[in-house]
A protein has these predicted regions:
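Short, structured active-site "lid" loops
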Residues: 41-61
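Alpha-helix C-terminal capping segments
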Residues: 19, 46, 66-74
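N-terminal beta-loop-helix "entrance" segment that forms/cooperates
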Residues: 25-48
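Residue-level detector of anion-binding/catalytic polar loops
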Residues: 23, 51, 74
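Short, acidic/small-residue loops that bind anionic groups at enzyme active sites
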Residues: 70-87
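Short glycine/serine/threonine-rich phosphate/pyrophosphate-binding segments
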Residues: 6-11, 34-37, 57-66, 84-87
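Glycine-rich phosphate/diphosphate-binding loop of Rossmann-like nucleotide-binding domains
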Residues: 1-33
Length: 87
């Protein structure tokens, strides 16, 4: 997720993953504010055997693009409604 404010939108997906016993991690990282941390997290997750990434971010939603630039694994981008309503 791009910020803590994205958490309420993503909680439903966490419940679905739990229901199907799919292991997952939750991490707040920003493609803009913490690009090095984002890169490190994705690289480390790849090394731990992560199968896919679900990236939620509001406003410009560049997180999914930043993650997909770092991995060959599937990346699902979840747009979060921001204060500009997509403008």
């Amino acid at each position: 997720m791009g910020s803590d404010s994205d958490l309420p939108v993503m909680e439903a997906s966490f419940e679905i993953l739990k229901k199907f016993d799919i292991p997952f991690e939750v991490k707040v990282t920003s493609a803009h504010r913490t690009p090095e941390a984002t890169h490190s997290f994705v690289t480390d997750a790849d090394a731990r055997g992560c199968a896919a990434f679900i990236c939620a971010a509001g406003m410009a939603a560049h997180l999914a693009g930043a993650v997909s630039a770092t991995t060959l694994k599937p990346v699902i981008g979840v747009p979060i409604n921001g204060s500009l309503d997509g403008l």
